[in-house]
Amino acid sequence: MTRSKFTSQGIKSKHAKKLKKQDYTVFSQKLGYTFKQPDLLQEALTHRSLGFPNNERLEFLGDSVLNCAVSTLLFKRFLLLPEGDLTRLRANFVNQDALHQLASALGIGELILLGDGERKSGGHQRPSILANAMEAIIGAIYLESGFEKVDQVIVALYDPLLNQLDPDLFGKDPKTLLQEYLQSRKVDLPEYSTLLTRGDAHAQVFHVECVIPEFAIRTSGEGTSRRRAEQEAARRAYKLAVVRH
């Protein structure tokens, strides 16, 4: 089997939509990795709204690879950090928000291949879709070049994020940060409510609101689970609270 002609499922891609050569070149430069098999990258960027094959299997693989690589990176970088803090810190770096941030920096939203309906509804900007594509790309690199190479790519991608870390905030998720900040100012804890749930049962997207009445702050978040949506809303509320108060 000639891999360059096949997807990770071993089936020739029949999708009419293709990546443009110029887009492929620019993306490779940003990513710091050039795919030897462009069809594999195309699969990683193909949303399930286009049918099969799509990037869901590569996303599954990339999720495991990313967790292993980030765990190793944090273990080596923060030698004195205890297991509990390392676990929470890793969660912050492999969650939807972090992956969406990486995907946006790479311009994945402009490259993602979507069905017409999904694109018209703004799918190319949806955090969950971009985060999933980021994981799929990581899975594709691993499949093509092995762990050592994908680990190098992941370290390069995460270095800027690690350099921005405030040591006092290690291992704390947005909801915890917001709660501690409000408690330090003797303000009532935020109120979370689900505004909307859309999508099929196996692929739901939650829209959650975070309200801090005393600060007149009202933010929203979106995620593939209620918890992820709450974390996103809390992250935005925390940023506003720190700036205003």
From Swiss-Prot:
Residues 173-243 form the DRBM domain. It catalyses: Endonucleolytic cleavage to 5'-phosphomonoester. It is found in: Cytoplasm. InterPro entries: dsRBD_dom, RNase_III, RNase_III_dom, RNase_III_sf. Its EC number is 3.1.26.3. GO terms for biological process: mRNA processing; regulation of gene expression; rRNA processing; tRNA processing. SMART domains: DSRM, RIBOc. The keyword Cell cycle does not apply. The active site is at 63, 135. Mg(2+) binds at residues 59, 132, 135. Keywords: Cytoplasm, Endonuclease, Hydrolase, Magnesium, Metal-binding, mRNA processing, Nuclease, RNA-binding, rRNA processing, rRNA-binding, tRNA processing. Its main location: cytoplasm. Residues 24-146 form the RNase III domain. GO terms for molecular function: double-stranded RNA binding; metal ion binding; ribonuclease III activity; rRNA binding. Pfam families: dsrm (PF00035), Ribonucleas_3_3 (PF14622). GO terms for cellular component: cytoplasm. Its cofactor is Mg(2+). Belongs to the ribonuclease III family. Homodimer. HAMAP family: RNase_III (MF_00104). PANTHER family: RIBONUCLEASE 3 (PTHR11207:SF0), RIBONUCLEASE III (PTHR11207). NCBIfam families: RNaseIII (TIGR02191). Digests double-stranded RNA. Involved in the processing of primary rRNA transcript to yield the immediate precursors to the large and small rRNAs (23S and 16S). Processes some mRNAs, and tRNAs when they are encoded in the rRNA operon. Processes pre-crRNA and tracrRNA of type II CRISPR loci if present in the organism. This is Ribonuclease 3.
